[in-house]
Amino acid sequence: MQAKHQRLILGIIALAAVIAAGFLALVAFKKQAAYFFTPTDAVKAHLPANRNIRLGGMVERGSLIREKDGVTIHFRVTDGYQKIAVSYRGIVPDLFREGSGVVADGHFDPSGSFTAETILAKHDERYMPPVTQQQAAATQTTLQEK
């Protein structure tokens, strides 16, 4: 076989290997991607009970109810069109409040309500942890005094 043909075959094999590796990486990434359903998407999808999903949206103002045990809360997640009642038992993140963004990991009960096992509070790009806010305020005060 000529050297030209050997290089061509080697190039084809290398190209096939790169395509196969890319395909495998894409399949693996798709399985690991963490998408969430908005309330509208969840209602349209008619998701089966006890299937774990992520539900994302805004905590509806006026919907947050804390039970006397101190760890159980009930609230509604909305995307502006649909609302879904959510129950959660556990400690909520500091940023969790009415009107803020939330992603809840959990499942729908046979009754249609959503039981969250984990709650993630979303924040905007201007968020600063409380310690950083205190440091920034102290720096601002120091600069104003000078």
UniProtKB/Swiss-Prot annotation:
The keyword Cell inner membrane applies. Keywords: Cell inner membrane, Cell membrane, Cytochrome c-type biogenesis, Heme, Iron, Membrane, Metal-binding, Signal-anchor, Transmembrane, Transmembrane helix. Disulfide bonds: none annotated. It is found in: Cell inner membrane. GO terms for biological process: cytochrome complex assembly. One of its GO terms (molecular function) is metal ion binding. The chain crosses the membrane at residues 8-28. Pfam families: CcmE (PF03100). Residues 1-7 are cytoplasmic. Heme binds at H123, Y127. It is a single-pass type II membrane protein. Belongs to the CcmE/CycJ family. Heme chaperone required for the biogenesis of c-type cytochromes. Transiently binds heme delivered by CcmC and transfers the heme to apo-cytochromes in a process facilitated by CcmF and CcmH. PANTHER family: CYTOCHROME C-TYPE BIOGENESIS PROTEIN CCME HOMOLOG, MITOCHONDRIAL (PTHR34128:SF2). NCBIfam families: PRK13254.1-1 (NF009727), PRK13254.1-5 (NF009731). This is Cytochrome c-type biogenesis protein CcmE. It comes from Zymomonas mobilis subsp. mobilis (strain ATCC 31821 / ZM4 / CP4). The gene is ccmE.
